[in-house]
Amino acid sequence: SYDLFPNKTVLGNITLAPTLVQKRDKAEVEKEAIALLERVGLADRKDAWPHELSGGQRQRVAICRALILHPEVLLFDEVTAALDPEMVREVLDVMLELADSGQTMLIVTHEMQFARAIADQVIMLEDGGIVEQSDDAEAFFTNPKTGRAKRFLHTFECDRHRRPAETP
């Protein structure tokens, strides 16, 4: 359900917290919510109910609901875990756009190709402890320091999947 309120439309889910908690003007919040929905490709679903949406659409609504609060950092915990492959791409595309726009995100993921494409810093955790930490994400993926990280990354063949170089 992505913790969407089943008795509220997409627009109602996004506008609830800013109007109720932050006491922001409803008309301004709705305008911003629609702009966020346009940003994630869901403006045409603003009047839909959560049960009418796919998993990927619900996840994108949840992202809009977080963004409308103007957070300094967005937290994502296995954001694609329950999604089918088509929906995974939709959500990852939104997250990539957020990163490109400068949004700071803390992402827990097993999507190693995506992590490599988007990360500035990487912390690999296992059993609640830090296996390896790198302030240089590319160095982590190309030359991990620990044997455990090397074995893990080899499983995903991360060295074969790189983000295309940007052209000047």
Language-model-detected regions and their locations in the chain:
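Conserved ABC ATPase signature
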Residues: 49-53, 57
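A short, proline-enriched helix->beta-strand linker immediately N-terminal to the Walker B motif
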Residues: 68-72
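Catalytic Walker B motif of ABC-type/P-loop ATPase nucleotide-binding domains
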Residues: 74-77
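Helical segment within the ABC ATPase nucleotide-binding domain
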Residues: 88-101
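H-loop/switch region of ABC-family ATPase nucleotide-binding domains
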Residues: 109-110
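A short, surface-exposed alpha-helical micro-motif characterized by mixed small hydrophobic
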Residues: 115-117
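C-terminal boundary and immediately downstream tail of ABC-type ATPase nucleotide-binding domains
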Residues: 138-168
